[in-house]
Every structure is written in C-alpha cells, then in structure tokens.
C-alpha cells in the first residue's frame, strides 16, 4: 500500500531487523521499525505504527493482553490509543489493537493487491 515505511537496522547499530513474514497485508501509511516481527498472514490496517516500544494490545478476549515487538500470525491490527498518566496530567498515547483474526472476508478486502501483483500492474 502507499506511503508505507519499513525500517532497517542502520540506526542504532544494535537494533534487530524488521521481519515481515509471508502474505502480510500492510495498509496505507503504516510504519514498522526497530526490529518488530510481523508474523505470517497478519493484517496491519491503515496508519498502524509499530516500534519496539509500541504496546500491541489483544482486545479479543475477556481481558486485554499486551505484547511488544511482535504481531502474532493472522492478527488484524488497527491503530489505537491508551491512557497514560504523566506529572502534567493524563494523556492518550498511541498503541496498536489486535481486534480479531484474519478470515475470508478479510482476504476479499485485501485481494485487490494480490490481483495487481499477479498481473504485474503498477499503480
């Protein structure tokens, strides 16, 4: 998708590489940097920003589960916000939310990109 940023490992030197496995859909304006690992068939919705310190919160169960640095296989991820207290008050900080698992309807929504690739069409 357009305007995607995928980081490398030039800065800082000790950083791990970004890993994006097979059949991942990366939506428009996503940024993935600082050694984040996106596992196979995950879907990153538009404007998701993932860094090594970004909280990725799975909200599909009864209680939220927080992880960092890794998007589990077949997860559907959207941008979100989380309240955080600071000395100057409470503010919203960015996070990513796992809202479900990839399914057939998700594949239909992302299939245009596959069709363009298969037919060697540049956009």
Which sequence ranges carry the predicted segments?
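Terminal amphipathic alpha-helical/low-complexity segments used for targeting or macromolecular assembly
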Residues: 68-69, 73-75, 79-123
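Structural signal for interior beta-strand "rungs" in well-ordered beta-sheet cores
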Residues: 1-85
């Amino acid at each position: 998708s357009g305007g995607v940023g995928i980081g490398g490992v030039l800065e800082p030197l000790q950083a791990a590489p970004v890993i994006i496995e097979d059949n991942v859909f990366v939506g428009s304006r996503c940024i993935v940097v600082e050694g984040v690992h996106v596992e196979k068939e995950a879907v990153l919705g538009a404007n998701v920003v993932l860094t090594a310190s970004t909280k990725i919160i799975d909200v599909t169960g009864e209680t939220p589960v927080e992880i960092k640095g890794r998007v589990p296989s077949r997860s559907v991820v959207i941008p979100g916000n989380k309240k955080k207290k600071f000395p100057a008050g409470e503010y919203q900080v960015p996070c990513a939310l796992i809202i479900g698992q990839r399914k057939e309807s998700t594949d239909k929504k992302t299939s245009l990109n596959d069709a363009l690739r298969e037919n060697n069409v540049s956009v």
